[in-house]
From Swiss-Prot:
GO terms for molecular function: mRNA binding; structural constituent of ribosome. NCBIfam families: rplM_bact. This is Large ribosomal subunit protein uL13. GO terms for biological process: negative regulation of translation; translation. It holds the Pfam family Ribosomal_L13. Keywords: Ribonucleoprotein, Ribosomal protein. InterPro entries: Ribosomal_uL13, Ribosomal_uL13_bac-type, Ribosomal_uL13_CS, Ribosomal_uL13_sf. Part of the 50S ribosomal subunit. It comes from the Bacteria.
Length: 144
């Protein structure tokens, strides 16, 4: 008997909704990364994208513990000389809450071509509504 290896066409994908309201950013991100990667499935295969689609709602209501709102920084570069842009997470959550959650999840996924495919299955929304009702997503509870 040999080890089971999932094939890309055998994978059945589900849709899950995670409500981030009042939840810690790291807890939401780890659960989302786990679902995107497919680690919760018995058919998990490291070199095949076995993950599911994840919808995160209420990204603006996610919380950070301690002093991270003021101390933690979001750094990006425009590509031009002197184009380094730095903002703290309080500003980032106020202006682009989706980016804060996406960056946290993206950091927990493999940094290769398979990881880039996995991140495309992540949908993050600022409020509590999303346009994916037709996919009949299941609610994924996070214990805080």
């Amino acid at each position: 008997m040999s080890t089971f290896m999932a094939k890309p066409h055998e994978v059945e994908r589900k849709w899950y909704v995670i409500d981030a309201a009042g939840k810690t950013l790291g807890r939401v991100a780890t659960e989302a990364a786990r679902l995107l990667r497919g680690k919760h499935k018995p058919i998990f295969t490291p070199h095949v994208d076995t993950g599911d689609y994840v919808i995160i709602i209420n990204a603006a209501k996610v919380r950070l513990t301690g002093n991270k709102l003021q101390k933690k920084q979001y750094i990006r570069h425009t590509g031009y000389p002197g184009g380094l842009r730095v903002m703290n997470y309080a500003t980032l959550l106020r202006t682009f809450p989706e980016r804060a959650v996406e960056k946290a999840v993206k950091g927990m996924i493999p940094h290769n071509s398979l990881g880039r495919k996995m991140v495309k299955k992540l949908k993050v929304y600022r409020g509590d509504s999303h346009p994916h009702a037709a996919q009949q997503p299941q609610v994924w509870e996070i214990k805080d």
